Design a protein with these regions (language model features):
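Active-site cradle of extracellular carbohydrate-active enzymes
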Residues: 179
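Mobile, glycine-rich extracellular loop/lid and propeptide segments
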Residues: 176
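C-terminal motif of bacterial Sec signal peptides marking the signal peptidase cleavage site
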Residues: 18-20
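Extracytoplasmic/secreted proteins, especially bacterial periplasmic and envelope-associated proteins
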Residues: 87, 91-95, 209-216, 220
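Hydrophobic ligand-binding cavity/cleft-lining segments
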Residues: 22-123
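Bacterial N-terminal signal peptides that target proteins for export
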Residues: 1-11
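Glycine-rich portal/gate segments that line the openings of hydrophobic small-molecule binding cavities
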Residues: 70-77, 84, 100-173, 186-202, ...
Length: 231
């Protein structure tokens, strides 16, 4: 069983579930697992027979300015995204916790799960070590993944929070960090909303790089939740 991040002080962040339909409300997240900003991506457009289709929808291109623990500032390309999965929260939460859903099988050369994580690098649930790129310009890096139920119970979650970030690797990749929040769709507990934020500053990257990665990992979470094999 993978460890959960210990619950510390709670951070509140106003989140909007559906722009134009609902107001802001403060949501408490475990310290360090909260999203950086209010998610501004639109929801998937409902249809006559589907309140939230299984597609991912992105915000406009953004730039994020953050602060490192040592006080140094940084900038990174940023995108927000929202999508739905036609499975209840407990099923989607189980899928999210599978380390293999974080693998971009379209771009990595190798992907290794480190569980338990290296304690001097990661205080989370597990790490992934990745080699990506095309030879001879490949990069190696490790990500730390932290996940927790923010509201509800482990086997009956109402809100979950996941954060991942680069903790070791190539200096050609100064910033790589992401956030995933999951919650039930309003009035449709059989459908789960997933909300992403992703920051990337790399030598050869763009907002399209982020768009491609989030499309892949959303698809892997969705397929895992539906019991489909992952490539």
């Amino acid at each position: 069983m993978r460890r959960l991040v210990k619950l510390g002080a709670l951070a509140s962040l106003p989140l909007v579930a559906f722009a134009g339909c609902y107001g802001n409300e403060a949501t408490a997240f475990p310290q360090g697992l909260e999203p950086w900003e209010e998610n501004v991506a639109p929801m998937p457009e409902p249809t006559a027979d589907d309140p939230c289709p299984e597609v991912i929808v992105f915000s406009e291109n953004r730039t994020f300015t953050g602060m490192r623990p040592d006080g140094r500032g940084y900038e990174a390309n940023s995108l927000h995204a929202r999508a739905c999965i036609h499975q209840p929260m407990d099923v989607v939460w189980e899928a999210i916790r599978d380390p293999q859903v974080g693998k971009d099988h379209t771009s990595v050369n190798s992907f290794t799960v480190i569980d338990p994580p290296m304690p001097d690098e990661c205080d989370g649930d597990y790490q992934t070590q990745i080699n990506a790129g095309t030879a001879p310009f490949t990069v190696d890096f490790r990500l730390c993944w932290r996940q927790q139920v923010a509201e509800g119970l482990e086997d009956a979650p109402l809100l979950t929070a996941t954060r991942w970030q680069k903790v070791w690797g190539s200096s050609a990749l100064p910033v790589l960090e992401g956030s995933l929040v999951s919650r039930p769709l309003e009035d449709h507990p059989e459908i789960t909303v997933v909300e992403y934020q992703y920051h990337l500053n790399a030598l050869t990257s763009s907002h399209q790089t982020i768009r491609d990665y989030l499309t892949v990992i959303y698809g892997r979470v969705r397929d895992r939740a539906h019991g489909r094999p992952l490539p």
